[in-house]
Each structure stands twice: as structure tokens, then as C-alpha cells.
């Protein structure tokens, strides 16, 4: 659970940069200067990050197998997103489904995805409808460092799960099976 804390003092915590890119843009530090839409977008991104963080703790509490699967999904998603950003010239969107459709090794595929995203969001003014240019982020290096930090965290957690054989020896699953057998 300490990996998914919101305590900023814990250095090896989940940072979630791909869920809240507004934190790295650095355009407006003073919230009073934000437009209403920008305030809504920032709150939305922060809430998405918080929901994911809490959901990961719940997955851990439910079963080690569910938690492992979620960690694998996050790990794969982050690697895909990082490759997408690197191979798109620094562009990023908050649409995970579209990013996952892209062949991240093919710049034409990425360009097609970005064009599709633009067409789908012609009338959208929110950040969810925005193509971020990571190269213009004030905190660009921190954005990539936090992505790498999260990837390392996921790798560490997956390694711990494997080394401790938590999925194979899940005490919650054993208790559930024992109770089911006693009922039957």
C-alpha cells in the first residue's frame, strides 16, 4: 500500500504522470489564472489518478492474482505510452484506447492515430481532447523520469510477487476454497 500512497515524501511511490500531464506542462502555477475549463480538466486528471491509486490498493486487498494482472497491465500500458511519445515526436493524448491501437514502432500508424484523435475532437476544448506536446512541458525531464520511475516500480512489484510466490500461495484464495469445500 505504501507504493500507492499520496504522501509526497515517499520517493518510490506511484506518480502517475500519464494520468495527469497538466502537472508537467507548468503553464499556470497560479490557479486563479486558470480558465474554468482548465480547472475542470486539472481536477479531472487528479481524480483519475486518485481513483487508479485507490483501485490498485483494492486490487491488492482482493487477491494477489488480481493485483498482479493489474500491475502487468500498467507496466505494458506505460511502456506502450512511452514508446508512443518517443516515436510521435513528443506528442501524447489521454486516450488509452487509441494509443493501444497504434503500432508504436510505425510513425505512420502513430500519425494516423493522432489524426483520428484530432478529427474525433474538433469541437472539444478540454484537455482530454488535447494533443499534448511533451517537448514544450516545463517539467519535460521530470515527466519522463516519473514515467521511468513508475515502470521501475511496476517491475519491482511484479518481481516481488513472483519471488514470494504470492499468486500460487494466495492465503485469501486458499481460505475461499476451504470455505467453498466446507459448504459443498
Predicted segments, located by residue:
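Helicase motor interdomain insertion/brace
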Residues: 1-184
Amino acid at each position: 500500500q505504501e507504493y500507492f500512497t499520496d504522501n509526497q515524501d515517499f520517493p518510490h511511490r506511484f506518480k502517475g504522470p500519464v494520468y495527469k500531464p497538466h502537472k508537467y506542462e507548468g503553464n499556470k502555477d497560479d490557479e486563479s489564472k486558470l480558465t474554468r475549463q482548465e480547472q475542470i480538466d486539472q481536477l479531472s486528471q487528479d481524480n483519475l489518478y486518485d481513483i487508479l491509486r485507490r483501485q490498485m490498493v483494492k486490487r491488492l486487498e482482493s487477491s494477489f492474482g488480481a493485483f498482479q494482472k493489474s500491475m502487468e497491465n500498467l507496466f505494458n500500458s506505460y511502456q506502450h505510452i512511452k514508446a508512443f511519445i518517443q516515436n510521435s515526436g513528443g506528442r501524447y493524448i489521454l486516450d488509452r484506447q487509441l494509443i493501444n491501437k497504434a503500432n508504436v514502432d510505425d510513425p505512420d500508424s502513430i500519425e494516423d492515430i493522432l489524426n483520428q484523435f484530432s478529427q474525433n475532437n474538433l469541437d472539444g476544448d478540454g484537455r482530454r481532447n488535447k494533443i499534448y506536446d511533451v517537448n514544450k512541458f516545463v517539467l519535460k525531464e521530470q515527466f519522463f523520469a516519473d514515467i521511468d520511475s513508475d515502470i521501475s516500480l511496476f517491475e519491482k512489484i511484479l518481481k516481488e510477487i513472483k519471488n514470494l510466490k504470492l499468486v500460487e500461495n494466495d492465503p485469501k484464495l486458499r481460505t475461499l476454497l476451504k470455505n467453498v469445500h466446507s459448504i459443498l
